[in-house]
Amino acid sequence: MKNKYKSVVVEGSIGVGKTTLATMLASSLESKLMLENFSENPFLEKFYKDVGKFNKYTKTSKYALATQLYFLLQRADEFKGKEYQALKRHNIISDYFIEKDKLFAKSILSSDEYRLYNRVHDGLKLDIEKPGLVIYLQTDAQTLIGRIKKRGVKFEGNITEAYLQKIIDSYTEFFHSYKDSPLLIINTSNVNVNDPHDYAMLLEEINKDIKGKIYFNPLS
């Protein structure tokens, strides 16, 4: 099946299944795959250790700003690099959305840090074409914790439900008013993309002329 969209972005909280679905779609839709590279961030493991202390009183980490600036600059380099320019000649499926940078920054940085982050962000003058389709994967924080434990990345073991709920709330707020691209919302508590029936229904939905915001609820 050909991909009718120049670019498709799969987004959602950590552990929700972005990379799995993006990889499947790239194969099914004969598209190039662009994956987030988080393993090179030298601050991420330290940040997640602090996240283990996250609660309603402690809402940030001394590594939060460095973590977010590293991701921002890394992604800016990727989108300006030769590899991405070559990828743009093809249809692309990605497991991250450049907009998520500001979403996470706003969620985890202090007000002073966020102002500094915005100065760096705005100074980069990133001009990236809006996706042809955004797929937003949802589930609850408790389910995410179970999936994170199952995949067994050691430093992710410090992630708490409180932290995940804050990220979920940030995504919900962001996509509530998002209108820049067609938006397909999937609750992965009810939809299993690894199930052949659900996945076939999803491909059928993606192949439609999606406009605005729709929720994917296949019949069982």
Language-model features and meaning:
Residues 101-169:
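A glycine- and Lys/Arg-enriched "phosphate-lid" helix/loop adjacent to the NTP-binding pocket
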Residues 13:
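P-loop (Walker A) phosphate-binding loop of NTP-binding proteins
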Residues 18:
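Conserved lysine of the Walker
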Residues 63-129:
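Glycine-rich phosphate-binding loop used to anchor ATP phosphates in small-molecule kinases
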